[in-house]
Amino acid sequence: LGNVLVCVLAHHFGKEFTPQVQAAYQKVVAGVANALAHKYH
C-alpha cells in the first residue's frame, strides 16, 4: 500500500518528485509500516 501511495504522489507531482523526494517518502512509508507491524503483531 505504501508503494502505491508513492506512485500516486510521483504521478501527481511529476518532475518535482525527484529521486531524493522519493527516497524520503519511501523512508517515511517504511517507518510507518514498521511501527504498525510492531503494534499489531
Curated annotation (Swiss-Prot):
PROSITE patterns: GLOBIN
Gene Ontology molecular function terms on file: haptoglobin binding; heme binding; metal ion binding; organic acid binding; oxygen binding; oxygen carrier activity; peroxidase activity
Location of the Globin domain: 1-41
Gene3D superfamilies: Globins (1.10.490.10)
PTM sites of type N6-acetyllysine: K39
GO BP annotation list: hydrogen peroxide catabolic process
Protein task: Involved in oxygen transport from the lung to the various peripheral tissues.
Subunit structure: Heterotetramer of two alpha chains and two beta chains.
Name used for this protein in its record: Hemoglobin subunit beta
Lineage summary: Eukaryota, Metazoa, Chordata, Craniata, Vertebrata
